[in-house]
């Protein structure tokens, strides 16, 4: 479904974005990779080509709307009209709220929230006149439920969800055929936990259970191919978080108050490498898609399979039920 399509991916140099572009290469898409880290971008482009796709890199800081707009222009000049735009890029700070500096809050918000705004804006300016196209927002269970030590990131993810809902309703009002969908992710094993700006005493980690970036990437690409659903949840932990927040938010407050700080740290010392909030960590080194938690990470999710195959599953259950009723009726005769 994506063969020959022009697909833009922000945050494409590492982590989930890197895993996404590799899958797009396997689908023989024309992939535009946007990020700051040029070494990671170059390695990602090589992987796309090796997988069978076409790749072009467009170094840009998504927090700057001028750079995003210029990148979108360059994509259409070099690859053709943009069919799909996938927002993945983000940054964060791991620290208690009162230890985060104002400029760090501003920067996290500019990258993680406004980066999606500028990407969506650039995509819509090109898609709406053509009345076709797909925008995929990479979200998180933390778009529904805030946790300690990540107030800037959680606030940005909540903002993306509200922003996306607003834009979707405007597209529906205009009877536009442009689709916008959101994929809410669980904890993912990405390099971000090695390069995030952190003031914790120990090495930050995703809140278990942890999934490999390919699990997230497959769900994101699936959403790009099936954008009519307004939202996708990835992993049973994401579903449990969202449903739990709806049913018993106060209980989750108390639970996270007791467990949320320790569950986001290992017993190892804090990394001493570059923090990517201000400068790309992968400017001179390629980190790839995976972080430091391969041994503890799951490479598949039953919940994702059930979500993507619910129509076939329902049909199979209906067929089974019908057959059972028919057999029962036959026996009564």
Which residue stretches match the model-derived regions?
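The beta1-alpha1 cofactor-binding region of Rossmann-like NAD(H)/NADP(H)-dependent oxidoreductases
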Residues: 39, 60-70, 102
């Amino acid at each position: 479904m994506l063969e020959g399509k022009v697909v833009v991916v922000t945050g494409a140099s590492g982590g989930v974005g890197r895993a996404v572009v590799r899958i797009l290469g396997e689908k023989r898409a024309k992939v535009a990779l946007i990020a700051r880290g040029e070494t990671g971008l170059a390695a990602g482009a090589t992987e796309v080509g090796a997988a069978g796709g076409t790749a072009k890199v467009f170094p840009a800081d998504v927090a700057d709307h001028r750079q995003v707009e210029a990148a979108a222009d360059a994509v259409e000049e070099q690859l053709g009209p943009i069919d799909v735009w996938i927002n993945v890029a983000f940054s964060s700070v791991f620290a208690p709220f009162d230890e985060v500096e104002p400029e760090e809050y501003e920067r996290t918000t500019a990258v993680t929230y406004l980066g999606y705004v500028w990407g969506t804006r650039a995509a819509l300016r090109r898609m709406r006149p053509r009345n076709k196209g797909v925008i995929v927002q990479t979200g998180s269970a933390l778009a529904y439920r805030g946790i300690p030590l990540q107030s800037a990131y959680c606030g940005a993810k909540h903002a993306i969800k509200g922003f996306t809902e607003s834009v979707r309703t405007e597209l529906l009002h205009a009877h536009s055929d442009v689709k916008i969908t959101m994929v809410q992710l669980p904890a993912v094993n990405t390099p971000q936990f090695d390069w995030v700006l952190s003031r914790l005493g120990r090495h930050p980690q995703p809140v278990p259970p942890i999934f490999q970036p390919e699990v997230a990437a497959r769900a994101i690409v699936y959403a790009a191919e099936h954008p009519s659903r307004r939202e996708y949840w990835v992993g049973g932990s994401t579903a449990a978080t969202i449903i739990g927040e709806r049913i018993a938010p106060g209980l989750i407050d108390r639970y996270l108050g007791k467990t949320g700080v320790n569950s986001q740290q290992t017993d190892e010392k804090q990394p001493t490498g570059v923090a990517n909030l201000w400068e790309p960590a992968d400017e001179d080194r390629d980190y790839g898609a995976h972080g430091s938690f391969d041994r503890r990470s799951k490479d598949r999710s039953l919940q994702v399979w059930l979500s993507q195959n619910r129509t076939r599953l329902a049909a199979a259950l209906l067929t089974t039920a019908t057959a059972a009723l028919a057999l029962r009726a036959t026996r009564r005769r």
